[in-house]
Amino acid sequence: MAQIKLTPEELRSSAQKYTAGSQQVTEVLNLLTQEQAVIDENWDGSTFDSFEAQFNELSPKITEFAQLLEDINQQLLKVADIIEQTDADIASQISG
């Protein structure tokens, strides 16, 4: 049987940290994409083409990671809600 030692409030606090992490990852990717455009305007040749191909290959993986962090946020929020609801259900069964 699972044992959760965190309160719903603590789970929600953790969930917010995952959202913040997702936003930070997205912001970094956006900044690097802008920087990539600056480099692109000033660097021609096959070396840059290889560099750009690598960047373009990795960018979607970073976007997927940001989405994963958002998904974890949603899962933690659901768990917090379930814990609260279960606690309320048990309390109502006991009291009456």
From Swiss-Prot:
Q: Where is the signal peptide?
A: none
Q: Which Pfam families match?
A: WXG100
Name the domain of life this protein comes from.
Answer: Bacteria
Indicate the transmembrane segments per the record.
Answer: none
Q: InterPro entries, from UniProt?
A: ESAT-6-like_sf, T7SS_ESAT-6-like
Describe its partners and assembly state: Homodimer.
Which family, according to UniProt? Belongs to the WXG100 family. sagEsxA-like subfamily.
Give the protein name, as stated in the record.
ESAT-6-like protein SAG1039
Q: Give the originating organism.
A: Streptococcus agalactiae serotype V (strain ATCC BAA-611 / 2603 V/R)
Organism placement in taxonomy: Bacteria, Bacillati, Bacillota, Bacilli, Lactobacillales
